[in-house]
Amino acid sequence: MSKFIEPSSEDIKIEQLYKDMGLSDEEYAKVCDILGREPNFTEIGIFSVMWSEHCSYKHSKPFLTQFPTSGEHVLMGPGEGAGVVDIGDNQAVVFKVESHNHPSAVEPYQGAATGVGGIIRDIVSIGARPINLLNSLRFGELTEKQNRRLLRGVVAGIGGYGNCIGIPTTAGEIEFDDRYDGNPLVNAMCVGIIDHDMVQKGTAKGVGNSVIYVGLKTGRDGIHGATFASEELSEDSESKRPSVQIGDPFVGKKLMEATLEAITFDELVGIQDMGAAGLTSSSSEMAAKGGSGLHLRLEQVPTREQGISPYEMMLSETQERMLLVVEKGTEQKFLDLFDKHELDSAVIGEVTDTDRFVLTYEDEVFADIPVQPLSDEAPVYVLEGTSPEYNETKNDYSSVDVESVFDQLLQHPTIASKRYLYEQYDQQVGANTIVKPGLQASVVRVEGTDKAIASTIDGEARYVFNNPYEGGKIVVAEAYRNLISVGATPLAMTDCLNYGSPEKKEIYQQLADSTKGMAEACEVLSTPVVSGNVSLYNETRETSIFPTPVVGMVGLIDDISYLNHFNPSVGDTLYVVGDTNDDFGGSQIEKLLYGQVNHEFESIDLSQEVRKGESIKQAIREGVASHVQTVGKGGLLLTLARISAHYQLGLQAKLSVTNAQLFSETQGRYIVIVKNGQSLNCDYAVEIGKVTNDQQFKVTNEQSEIVRDVKHLNDLWEGAIPQCMTATD
């Protein structure tokens, strides 16, 4: 008789328990076909997480194949824990972005903290030392108490984990819109550095080689976390707090250092983080990639409490754990290393030649599954999509009250300074951060060299909602411009696709069209996709989030001396690069004045993006530019205001645009500040003004004049979010 009391195979079938785990009738039937029998409780649990949307990408896989994944600098693309890109001198940059949306909606502190911990382990599992963290966040409007609570918890969780483990958080972006009420997006990105010959893979091969577990003891936290992340949020989601993992950054730090030492051992065969789906995904994926079988003896798994069943062990998402495959006979060398770092570890199995994934507990078999079908035969769904109907009524911007709109947009949390939030993050630990949060890209020195890695993270929603294909191109181009703005050469990107339910025709079409646009932009801008993540079913009470693809991009600065002059001063000249048109679809002014965003906008010219980018990058490298800012949310006027407030400098500019166009969000534009006595050599550049010493922000056009004291401007910009967050609940 089994030591554990669990539903029988017959119970699972008759009571349709598989549906509670997220499997359909058809998927259950497919499992039965693969096994040649009805699955037991542990087996159906394993299939349910491996075939969940979060792990299998069953609705998005056809679209992901569009992305270019190879290129001049790519050493390792999708399929491993993170992408690896060459930066010269036998070094590479390793990076990836992941979502932790559903857990953060239920338990914001732990949801965000474990999102940070998980992405760090992805980078470490490749063998890289993390050098910085980034994040992309979305919340509902801060007028709502619930959204303020979520924001506080998420920011505290990000800072709490990153600060404790000793990795600086150097860049990010946050936007606010009521479409994210109760359904925040928390996307975390990590960047690391590695030597070429130290790159590791998550593979299990070599018959007889041993499987070693290391890290926190397994508990019952996070069981079915992958399944939870693959369903819509509902009023019952609060009851799923046990599906949210608990992070321990102090153990995370020990595990990181131990892992980075373990990768120097020649006897290491493969290594993988135990992330989504825990021991199930790490072990079965390693076996599949190695073309091997595995036998795990689950009584050897370190557990936090007695009585944890094989089902619970395999589906637990206890944090701070790694799985290694090491050469037979060298186990003690690794166990001694982990003992030195005060980590629990154990040999829990071995590689076999059976091509079967076998789990036993004290010789009782709890699972016997063919490896390849579990990993490779998850269902893939190609559905029918429908383009949404848009409101074709043309909004009138002919009588815009410039003064009122300017003050309101400057203080909207999406545009306002985020200093109140990012000051909770340690930005300098490691002492290699050159450009800190507040600008569009971070710059971190590659230790011991004159090189630096520039990194940025950028998401787009309203444009993607308005026109998914063009919006997909825009989000890639925005990240590209952010790297150009610090003089970096963009190398490659990672993506996180945040959408609602793909089973709804309009959302499925948004996913299809936006990924097509992203793929096209990647090709033209030479930024292949080397890693990524998909997060679907981001819906609450039948309301879907905006489709929100997020792009993390890295670039190389081959000589950090380029940035020595990067600080504007009085007498410098202002240029705008790129034309301004009537582009209000999806803009901040459209949302402010009309309460909705559903109008078309002009298409983006990707070939122009490349030409402008090369000219601006050259200006930075030649010491001509003292600051570069992409024109983003709120348009030209708000971009100039942010520069003035950020540097506490007066600006005087005259713009050849209408009042409404002051707030237009035409793509492909930059503000370039050029050193006094220099000029900008760029076909698309127009001189518009100067940096002044009178502490006045003054912008004029044919119709209006906006004048603000810089201190007052800064007080409004810096004070907006603190004022929202200290509102009486």
UniProtKB/Swiss-Prot annotation:
The keyword Acetylation does not apply. Disulfide bonds: none annotated. Mg(2+) 1 binds at E98, N533. It catalyses: N(2)-formyl-N(1)-(5-phospho-beta-D-ribosyl)glycinamide + L-glutamine + ATP + H2O = 2-formamido-N(1)-(5-O-phospho-beta-D-ribosyl)acetamidine + L-glutamate + ADP + phosphate + H(+). ATP binds at Y57, K96, D495, G532. Keywords: ATP-binding, Cytoplasm, Ligase, Magnesium, Metal-binding, Nucleotide-binding, Purine biosynthesis. This is Phosphoribosylformylglycinamidine synthase subunit PurL. It comes from Staphylococcus saprophyticus subsp. saprophyticus (strain ATCC 15305 / DSM 20229 / NCIMB 8711 / NCTC 7292 / S-41).
